[in-house]
């Protein structure tokens, strides 16, 4: 099993696209039910959260969804900031241990965690 937990931050238009990507999956045959979208969001940033224990064979599915989400373009062009969706996910595999998945700059970067998050695996 693999424990996946994390979040994305975005704007209104991007959140609508994230929901479209998530809702395209059948929750009876995927782990798309792990996504949560707060009913009331505050200020300018919108949030999407994911939490769930999934089978290791489904990790490719989750990775593909994050890659799709990462490629959602900025709603408004800004030369100073990259306004595409960004976020952080901690992925704990029973065998391979923990990895950190960073969504930013239009892509997904998977690596070792920068912090000591192993207490989450207790």
Report each predicted region and the residues it spans.
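Short, extreme N-terminal segment that most often corresponds to the first beta-strand
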Residues: 1-23
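Charged interaction segments
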Residues: 21-122
